[in-house]
């Protein structure tokens, strides 16, 4: 069994990116810049954004965090985004979710200039993903999953891939990326009947449902590749959506939780920020 080590791979990829960013800055005198916006005082949001700031510094990308009070109105937030859209020194914009209930998430996402939409959530980028447009900014977690498969030499062409979970953030975009990579793809969700009949056929099984140890050994094919996107807190520990202890000896390769997909998400955010800077300054 191969352990797909996202932490180690992420470190290698950041080192590669740091070299590319340094060369880019030397050749263009442009420093890629990410602006992250937090609305309110959600502790998890602050932790996530702090880790993104730290990662930016590691590769030579400028970052700025704008923290707005909980009572910020939607129109005030949209006005700020408009200013950032028109600021040529800002290449990438991230609005940390969740937002307070009085702010419409979609209105906010749709207001970000597609070329600065570092999370890849804007409908333009969703459409570009479908069309395999090279200018597409791919959603960070799905992009990280595909990078893991590629870097570990896991063949997608002709493979049967099953994605459990159909969210806009992970399930749908990773299904599309797998399709683009010439896999045959089935996307399962809460209305799927007889889930096991699908998962036991998967050469590549990707799970993103937010339910601890949801996928058990009897649901996985011998020799499959398993990517566990879940992050769940159980008895003070972080566990995935896959019963790792039971499944690991049955599969060819598997990601751990923590230390699997998570670190790759932030690394791909850095790569997307660099892509934004390059595209905006062509």
Curated annotation (Swiss-Prot):
SUPFAM superfamilies to which the protein is assigned, alphabetical: Aminoacid dehydrogenase-like, N-terminal domain, NAD(P)-binding Rossmann-fold domains
Pfam families xref list: THF_DHG_CYH, THF_DHG_CYH_C
Any GO CC annotation of this UniProt entry: cytosol
Keyword terms of this UniProt record: Amino-acid biosynthesis, Histidine biosynthesis, Hydrolase, Methionine biosynthesis, Multifunctional enzyme, NADP, One-carbon metabolism, Oxidoreductase, Purine biosynthesis
Molecular functions (GO terms): methenyltetrahydrofolate cyclohydrolase activity; methylenetetrahydrofolate dehydrogenase (NADP+) activity
Catalytic activity: (6R)-5,10-methylene-5,6,7,8-tetrahydrofolate + NADP(+) = (6R)-5,10-methenyltetrahydrofolate + NADPH; (6R)-5,10-methenyltetrahydrofolate + H2O = (6R)-10-formyltetrahydrofolate + H(+)
Residues passing through the membrane, by range: none
Gene Ontology biological process terms in this record: L-histidine biosynthetic process; methionine biosynthetic process; purine nucleotide biosynthetic process; tetrahydrofolate interconversion
Listed EC numbers: 1.5.1.5, 3.5.4.9
SS bond partners: none
Annotated NADP(+) binding sites: 165-167, 231
Record pathway: One-carbon metabolism; tetrahydrofolate interconversion
Assembly behavior: Homodimer.
Function: Catalyzes the oxidation of 5,10-methylenetetrahydrofolate to 5,10-methenyltetrahydrofolate and then the hydrolysis of 5,10-methenyltetrahydrofolate to 10-formyltetrahydrofolate.
Family of this protein: Belongs to the tetrahydrofolate dehydrogenase/cyclohydrolase family.
Protein's UniProt name: Bifunctional protein FolD
Organism: Francisella tularensis subsp. novicida (strain U112)
């Amino acid at each position: 069994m191969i352990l797909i080590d996202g932490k180690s791979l992420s470190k290698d990829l950041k080192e590669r990116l740091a070299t590319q960013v340094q060369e880019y800055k030397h050749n263009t005198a442009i420093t890629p810049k990410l602006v992250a916006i937090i609305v309110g005082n959600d502790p998890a949001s602050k932790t996530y954004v702090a880790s993104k700031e730290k990662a930016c510094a590691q590769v030579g990308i400028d970052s700025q965090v704008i923290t707005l009070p909980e009572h910020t109105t939607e129109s005030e937030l949209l006005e700020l985004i408009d200013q950032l859209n028109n600021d040529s020194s800002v290449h990438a914009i991230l609005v940390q979710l969740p937002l307070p209930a009085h702010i419409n998430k979609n209105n906010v996402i749709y207001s970000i200039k597609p070329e600065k939409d570092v999370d890849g959530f804007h409908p333009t980028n969703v459409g570009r993903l479908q069309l395999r447009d090279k200018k597409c900014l791919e959603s960070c977690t799905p992009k990280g999953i595909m990078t893991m498969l590629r870097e570990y030499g896991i063949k997608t062409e002709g493979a049967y891939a099953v994605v459990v979970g159909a969210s806009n953030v992970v399930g749908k975009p990773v299904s599309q990326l797998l399709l683009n990579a010439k896999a045959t793809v089935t996307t399962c969700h809460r209305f799927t009947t007889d889930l096991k009949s699908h998962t036991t056929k998967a050469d590549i099984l990707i799970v993103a449902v937010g339910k601890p140890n949801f996928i058990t050994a009897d649901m996985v094919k011998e020799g499959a590749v398993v990517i566990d996107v879940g992050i769940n807190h159980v008895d003070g520990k972080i566990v995935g959506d896959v019963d790792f202890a039971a499944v690991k000896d049955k599969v060819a390769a598997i990601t751990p939780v923590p230390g699997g997909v998570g670190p790759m998400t932030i690394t791909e955010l850095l790569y997307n920020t660099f892509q934004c800077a390059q595209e905006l300054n062509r």
